[in-house]
Amino acid sequence: MAKKHSKRYQELLKKIDKDVYNLKEAAEKVKELKSAKFDETVELALKLGVDPRHADQMIRGSVVLPHGTGKTVKVAVLAKGAKADEAKEAGADIVGEEEVLEMIQNGNLDFDILIATPDMMGKLGRFGKILGPKGLMPNPKTGTVTMDVAQAVKNAKAGQVNFRVDKKGNMHVGIGKASFDAEKIYENAVAFIEKINKMKPASAKGRYIQNAALSLTMSPSVKLDVNELTEYK
């Protein structure tokens, strides 16, 4: 049965007066779709022409958005000694070895990003089922397994977005807030799409960005012109 949308949603749909928008227009249009009482997240959805079952087509990484995400990010760092001190100085919220491991074991995942030094990864293996589904397992591809914990903490606090395609090639990321001006939404989107385009696998066949849309948490989607998106390099 078709999903019945609310009257509010139907009114918002009327504001989307074109089938596709270029990115700049879409950044302006999503601001017109604000309807919730809270500061909605601006979400970018992409469908990529990749098959993540092939290791070389698993698109995964991170990018620091020029204007951040608008979200206060809580960072935990699994490290000891001098590296723990560096993480604290850089502004990490939770730092340590036993303390952090105990939190994870108890299912107390009161953080948005977990960073670990390489020597700590052996201790995290048994927590794969806890951290994996939440996207919290540190990974070198997202810069969260590193000896440079200070820079990783700064990146996380500055608005680093970690991303990966699902098994069907879809990807959803928050790139800002409805309260951002349209130019900031646009520039964040450009930074993200440039990163995705740079990661196009040589083995991917056909169109790389197949579908793309911008939306707010509670709004309909504004469809993007995928031909334009391929030009951001």
UniProtKB/Swiss-Prot annotation:
Superkingdom, according to UniProt? Bacteria
One GO CC term of this entry?
A: cytosolic large ribosomal subunit
Q: GO molecular function terms here? A: rRNA binding; structural constituent of ribosome; tRNA binding
The protein's UniProt keywords, in alphabetical order, are: Repressor, Ribonucleoprotein, Ribosomal protein, RNA-binding, rRNA-binding, Translation regulation, tRNA-binding
Q: Which GO terms describe its biological process?
A: regulation of translation; translation
Against SUPFAM superfamilies, the record matches this protein to: Ribosomal protein L1
Chain coiled-coil ranges: none
Q: Which InterPro entries match?
A: Ribosom_uL1_bac-type (IPR005878), Ribosomal_uL1 (IPR002143), Ribosomal_uL1-like (IPR023674), Ribosomal_uL1/biogenesis (IPR028364), Ribosomal_uL1_3-a/b-sand (IPR016095)
For this chain, the family text in UniProt reads: Belongs to the universal ribosomal protein uL1 family.
What is the role of the protein in this entry? Binds directly to 23S rRNA. The L1 stalk is quite mobile in the ribosome, and is involved in E site tRNA release. Protein L1 is also a translational repressor protein, it controls the translation of the L11 operon by binding to its mRNA.
Q: How does it assemble?
A: Part of the 50S ribosomal subunit.
Protein name, entry field:
Large ribosomal subunit protein uL1
Which species is listed as the source? Nautilia profundicola (strain ATCC BAA-1463 / DSM 18972 / AmH)
